[in-house]
Amino acid sequence: MGVYAITGLRVISQLEKQEHETINIDWKTGDIQADLSIPEGRQKVIDELHELHPEGLDGLILCAGVPGSCHDLRLILSLNFFGTISIIKGAYDLLEKKGGSCVATVSNAISQGDLRMDLADILNNNNEDELRILDLVSNLDENDLLTGNRLYVASKYALARWVRRHSASYAANGVRINAVAPGNVNTSMTATMSVDEKTALNALPIPTKYGKETLMEPDEIASAINFLISKEARGVNGIIMFVDGGTDALLNSEKVY
């Protein structure tokens, strides 16, 4: 199970322990089952959310995503970026009714990864033209891992920027929106990596894990998400919270904004 799936499940577990009602959206096993990489699946989610809770939503958390190594460049953009912003926009009126909040999951790679900034700009400035953008990346080599990783970082960078751009107008109508940028996380997928793969992954330092040869835990990411979605964070809006044990601060110590 990948980082996005396991993080989403841990978020649900924490919320249910606090006796919140939750709705799990997943393409296979969710309370609402839909493919967020296609417009029809997104509309199904939006319609069912309105049917289930016409009175509004207290919170919306978007954890769906695929890595750059999935060998499907269209999927990277359609799920990581277009799927996420479509659900946020489609459920916005439900959040507005209850003064709810929204958290999207990006990645700490946005501050350190090798990305296609031209593509990030296209995503942000032409996000109503999904099909044309997907056709554009279809011409790239999806078996090239570097290309996949660059598109992955671009999709998450564009999502983080989308959150920032919309945060002020959303908050003016009572809806907070923030993003969490996780570092490398322990999952069933990382557990099955080869020794060389684990060595490469651990080469990226995590200050809070020094000497432990381990990664961030899913519950650490989930706790940050649940804080941002809660009333305790009512003064927090438009931030990208790095939950990476200090990796971003270590690599970008001179950047304060």
Description of each model-found segment:
Residues 181-192, 196:
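Short, flexible catalytic-loop segment of classical short-chain dehydrogenase/reductase
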Residues 93, 168-169, 234:
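Alpha-helical segment proximal to the catalytic Tyr-Lys
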Residues 25-41, 49, 62-65:
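Rossmann-fold cofactor-recognition segment
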Residues 176, 236-238:
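Short, small/polar-rich loop/turn modules that mediate ligand/substrate recognition or access, typified
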Residues 1-23:
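Canonical Rossmann dinucleotide-binding motif of NAD(H)/NADP(H)-dependent dehydrogenases/reductases
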Residues 207-221, 232:
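A conserved structural motif in NAD(P)-dependent oxidoreductases
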Residues 65-70, 98-172, 184-187:
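Catalytic loop of short-chain dehydrogenase/reductase
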